[in-house]
A protein has these predicted regions:
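Hydrophobic ligand-binding cavity/cleft-lining segments
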Residues: 1-40
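Short, hydrophobic/aromatic-rich segments at coil-to-beta transitions
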Residues: 40-47, 63-71
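Structural motif
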Residues: 11, 42, 62-64, 89-91
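Short, surface-exposed coil-to-beta transition loops
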Residues: 3-5, 53-56, 78-83
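Short, charged/polar surface micro-motifs in flexible loops or helix N-caps
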Residues: 51-55, 61-68, 75-77
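Beta-strand/loop substructures that line and gate deep hydrophobic ligand-binding cavities in soluble
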Residues: 71-129, 133
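A structural signal for short hydrophobic beta-strand segments in well-ordered beta-sheet cores
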Residues: 37-39, 59, 84-86
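Hydrophobic pocket/interface hotspot
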Residues: 17-21, 27, 46, 59, ...
Length: 133
């Protein structure tokens, strides 16, 4: 199984980036690879319409370490852990997302990587404009 670390540097304070990325209601604004619509809360779980169908998302508890890991339970019942970190960077914050190939073909892995790159670019765009607080 291969892993890839996809990252983007965002010209914003790490705490601001973390707060935005860790807020589930913001997922549809930046994570099109995961959320195509509003997030529905069911206890600690979140239901999201994704390109794969309805998925359940569970985030780690908010923390001061910049960890925004989340599990995604796919429609078939498989659970995928998505490690996501917000790190301090000389130019603001660096967001690092780890993608694991698991049972994906090489082409699927490449497509998944491209989706994550687009999502992180959207996150950067949102946070480097005057939009979100």
């Amino acid at each position: 199984m291969r892993s890839r670390h996809v990252s983007v540097v965002i010209n914003a304070e790490p705490a601001r980036v973390y707060d935005f990325a860790a807020e589930p209601d913001n997922l549809p604004r930046w994570a099109a690879g995961l959320a195509k619509s509003e997030v529905v809360r069911r206890g600690d779980e979140l239901l999201v319409e994704s390109p794969m169908g309805t998925v359940t998302v569970r985030f780690v508890p908010r923390n001061g370490l910049g960890v925004v890991d989340h599990e995604v339970v796919l429609p078939a019942g498989d659970t995928v852990l998505n490690p996501l970190r917000v790190l301090a960077h000389p130019e603001g914050a660096e967001v690092v997302f780890t993608i694991r190939q698991l049972a994906m073909s090489d082409d699927e892995f490449d497509r998944d990587t491209q989706m994550v790159e687009k999502d992180l670019a959207q996150l950067k765009s949102l946070l480097e404009t005057a939009g979100p607080a």
